[in-house]
Amino acid sequence: MEKHITTPITQKITKDLRSGDYVYITGEMYVARDAAHKRMIEALDRKEELPIDIKDSTIYYMGPSPARDGRPIGSAGPTTATRMDKYAPRLLDLGEKAMIGKGKRSKEVIDAVIRNKAVYFAAVGGAGALLSKCIKSSEVICYDDLGAEAIRKIYVEDFPVIVVIDLSLIHISEPTRRVV
């Protein structure tokens, strides 16, 4: 099924998403990869506030190439999500509602998605140039010393993703296995 949604992504939205749905997202989301995730978890360990508003947020696992030709961002393809698996459950428990990446997730992440009524989307790997056309603005908001791995806030229009893990306990990456 094809769906169009806007951020922030809330439980009201996630409850209606099913594995295999084609979804087009419009709105603000964050971009962060493993180095930024590590720093966020270290900040939490030090009892510091996160540098982003995690409640009902969407984090796209991506490290963009430099912007060209007046575009807000360069190629913007997804990063392998397993690199964030050791950090994702804690952020989900704090209110993150959606993750975008590519590839499978660990059982711990799947459990956290279900527990927090969140969702994991996949973006098409190898389509970074095409995906970047959906990104209308991009701003580094913290950890700028990380370069391409800095946390960015982006605004997207009709950003195409596929639901991989939903709340039905069946996920597209292992369609014959029922997760309980």
Q: Where are the language model's segments positioned?
A:
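Long terminal accessory segments
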Residues: 156-169, 173
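Short, structured beta-strand/loop micro-motifs enriched in basic residues and often containing a Trp
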Residues: 1-9
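Feature captures the catalytic cores and cofactor-binding loops of soluble hydro-lyases/lyases
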Residues: 31-32, 36-159
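Single conserved hydrophobic/aromatic residue that forms the stacking wall/gate
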Residues: 131, 171-180
